[in-house]
Each structure stands twice: as C-alpha cells, then as structure tokens.
Amino acid sequence: MGQVLSEERKPAPLSHEELVKELANIFADKCFTPLELYSLKQVFKSLAHHEQHVGYLKEGTIATYLNVPDILGVSPVLFQMVTYIAAFPFLEDAPAFLGLQQMVIVITLMTDRYRRVLRKDAADKTKLLFKSLAVYDRKLSRPAADMHSGLTNAREQAGNDRQALDNDELVLAAFDALGHVIPDKQQNMLATHEAMIPGDKFRKFIMLLLLVAPLDPQGRLDSDPNRVTGTGLQCLRTAAESILAAFLDVERKPGVEYLRFSKVIASCLPFLFRGLTPLFEYFLFSEELDFHKGKKGTSRSPTMFPEPEQPILQDTGSIMNASILSQMSFFLPGNLLFRRLRLLYAGDEDGFSMGSFEAKVFKWKAPTILLVCGTRLRDDSDHHSNGSAPAFWASLPPRRFPRGSSGEAERLTFGVYVPEPWKLTHRDCFGGEDTILFQLEPIHDLFRASSLNKDHISFARPSASPSHAGVSFGCPPPRPSQAYRRSSIIALGPVSLMLDSSFEFGCFTHDYASKGGAFHTSMIREYDFQERFEIGSVEVWGCGGDEEAKDQAERWAWEAREAEARRRINLGTGDIEADRALLEMAGLIGSNRNGGSMA
C-alpha cells in the first residue's frame, strides 16, 4: 500500500509549455542584464498584438521594427526561421507563436548568448539554422539523377543527410540544462523527411546576411538606403549569387542539403551568421529609455541629434563596394574591414605597372587586400588574336584543365589577404600561414595557406627574363639555374594566381589531384580547373586606421623631400651662367653630353 501511495504522489511530468517557460527563465537570468530585459519587455509591449489577453508578434511587425527592406522579399523567410527557433527545444512543435518567452529564446540563440548556459560541445548552431530555413518535402529534394543511374548515390547522400540531422547537440544540451530526458520520438522527428533549403529562399536570406554584416550594436538596417537601390542593389544580388553558387548547382538540385550547407560554411564562410547578433540585439534597446532626462521640470533638449554614422567604406573603387566588403567579412574579421580599409593602389587611376604598385603599396606597414577582376579569355579566338594575348598564352604551360564554369566572357574576381607588408622577392617568397587566396565571382571559394610550402607571395620586377616578372601567389620563385633563366615558360603552382608584369593578363590554377602546394585545394570544388583572363582592374586596400595612414603619409612625405633635395642641388656659386657652364663641362646638360675627364 505504501508503494501505491508513493507512486500516486509522484509529480506529473512537465508539459512542453512549462519546459519552454523554464528554459526561457534560465536564459533570461543567465544571458541578459536587468536593463536588457526591461528594454525587451518595453519593446515587446509596444509591438505585440493581442488575442484573448495573450500578446504575440506578427511577421510584418518584426520586419518593420528591424527595418528589413521590402525589396529583398525576405520577410517570410525571416519569420519562418524565427517561429521555428521559437519552438526550441521542442522543434516538432514549430511553428510557434512569438510570445515574450519565445522571443527570449530566439534572441538568446540568435545572438550566441546561449553559450553562457549550454555545454561547450553544443556551441555550434549551424544545424539549428539549417532546420529553421529548410522545407521537408521528399519530392522537392529528389534530384533528376534519381530517375537514371544516380539513384543509388542520391539515396546514399540522403541517408547521410538524415543521419547528420539526427541528435541535434544544441537541443540535447538544452534538455540537459532542464534536467529533462529527450524522448526518442522527438529526437528523430524531423529526420524522417528529406530536408532542403530551396535556392530562391536561400538567395534572399544571403542578401539579408550581406546587408546586416556591418551592423554595430544599435545599428539600423536603413542607415544606408543606397545599398538596396540602383547599383547598390545590383551589387548585393551579384554577391548573393556568387555565395549561393558555392552551396548549390541549380542545374542539378533545386535546394541546399545539410551536408553541403555545413561543409561550405565551415570551409569558406565561417562568419556568415555573425550579423544576426546585432540584428536581433536591436530588440534589447528601447527608445523609451531616455538617459538624458533630468530631475523634475527638465527634459531632453530638442536640439540633440545622433551623430552621423561613419561609412563602412571610406574610399571607392571599381572592384570594391559595400557588398564585396560584406562578402569578405564572412571569412575575415569585420574589425579588419568595416570603416578600416583605405585604397592604396588602383590600376584605373595609378596606372597598370609594377612601379606604380610598388610606390603606392610598399610603404603600408599593415595587412593589405589585393583584388583583381577581369574577363575570361576564350580558348581559340583570343589565343590567335593580335596584340599581347598570344605572347601571354605562350608563356604559360599548355592548358591541361577545363575552365571553372561554363560562361563565355564571364567576369572573374579573385583576391588575396596579405597579412604582412609587401617587399621585393628574389629567391624567397613572403606571406605566411595567415595568407588567404580567395575567389569572389562567379563563385565564392577559399584557399588557405599551407604551413609546409612557403611559396605564398612573389613580387618580381621585370628583368632580363621578362616572362618571370609579375605578381604571383602560390607560384615557386625564380631559380638561380641557367636553365630556369633561359626558359620562357612560367612555373605555375598547383593552387596559384599569377598576374603578368604589365597587369594585362592573369591565370588562376587549381590542380586538385596534387592536393595543393603553397595553398590548399578547394573544399567545395573537388576537381581540376584553370582560369585565364584579361585583367580589367587591380586594387590594393590597406587594413588599418588613422595611425597606419599617418605612418604611410610620413614615409611618402620624407621620400618627396629627399627627391626634391636631390633635384635642387646647389652648386654654391650663386651664378646661374657659371653653374650651367660647369654642368656642360661635366657633360650633364647641353649637346655635348660626353661626361667629364679625370685627367
């Protein structure tokens, strides 16, 4: 009888709603300051719609409050993501209504504050974000290859994706924090269907990520309307297409599967979602909080205005723009880029020569970013055309690899992050392990530096062996042997970018079978390819602030003073005619420039 009584007194298990409330309370206590919680409550109170005395947020309300531009068409995508994450950790209950507790959970997860509560081995939210954007439709995810010989491989890939989506570590960590055992039924609920992010939906979301990338705390998405109008909008779409191409081949599949999603982010876009933190932290700053209010009878001065924001890109270039800057921030720290870049060299303005490049760039004593864009050379007509193209083709090894993509006369954009000051190279290259070779257009890709092969960067002036001059990344430096000096063929590295000395042509090589040289092979394009292109523009941007720019200006000023002093040599006589006669005797001026005699 005692056993029966003890069983009757055992508390009933908590419902999903009660567990969600408990998790929200844990997050609120551990992840927010009292002021942030107060602000969130005030914001929610001002935005919430009510039904039966229950407040919640609608799609349009969230988009309007966050200043999401209508032109992107991303509001439904954002709302789907938020209502899915609001059901955390019971994701099978999604979509959830967006009450105050649900918004606490959403903001905690989207701003990475959950790391303060959940165990460290569950720090990655990539799987959660994928699920929040995905659709679960077997028909959508079935590729055309399933109808032919690719059926087995497609099924194996789908099985791998299902296995990868099982046992979400973040969900398990949340249940651990609650002291709750996750049922097997819930654990495998969403893995029973094919999960895929449709390409069009993901394109819109990438455009939003590009837009929010430079946001500061309390920053507004509408602070720069030029980014979503005219040329700015076109640049945003171009960058989004290049990034989407890394995830998806639309000719083969209509959407992005999880294994591809996680692989591309880990290898090429490690900071892709960082802009979501300031975006969702915007809920934590209430405009009703006025710290400028004084005592009784005083109020905030009506003449006080917020200081104008500094533009994220101070200078302009033919390659660099705000969207390219955001794209690079997905693999380079934002504190190196936003409001920190200065245009050091632009071929369009300074001339396409290594001399101009050296004069403008070599005095910058901080990291730099080189960008080069051009148009792909067509194999036949360009090879046999007039001009310098045939000479360029003759200087390269015979083509062994196909092009990286199928577009004719397609625009190509490559870049290199150079972590140390530039210098002339003779037998040894410079750069180091932090050097990054990357492609921005028409596909986003990354090639990180090797720690074993040191042939990272070479800057060789034109000499008696002109075919070996130029700027190269990943190519072996010139050898001292006579056979090498006599050779007219440039030695290309397995993964390399080469620009000729006139900055007229370039060549990018990706020898996947070699497994890389000074740079590792691509993690997302596991095949050989080569791009030969006519250069349209070259730019070098300095990473740094006012101190670096001041140091460079001082070096330039010193060189200008020295050059002027050498030009104005005072011969000491004060007699112009006598000085001229002396210079004529020395053979330095006049018609008899034969020099003087020591006899």
Swiss-Prot record:
The protein's matches in Pfam families, at most eight in alphabetical order, are given as:
TLD
The biological process GO terms on file are:
response to oxidative stress
Q: Does the keyword Cytoplasm apply?
A: yes
Q: What is its main location?
A: cytoplasm
One GO cellular component term of this record is: nucleus
Keyword list (alphabetical) reads:
Cytoplasm
* UniProt cross-references to SMART domains, sorted A to Z: TLDc
Against InterPro entries, the record matches this protein to: TLDc_dom
Query: Which stretches make up the TLDc domain?
Result: 318-544
Q: Where in the cell is it found?
A: Cytoplasm
Q: What does this protein do?
A: May be involved in a process influencing telomere capping.
Family stated for the protein in its record: Belongs to the RTC5 family.
The name on file for this protein is Restriction of telomere capping protein 5
Q: What is the lineage of its organism?
A: Eukaryota, Fungi, Dikarya, Ascomycota, Pezizomycotina
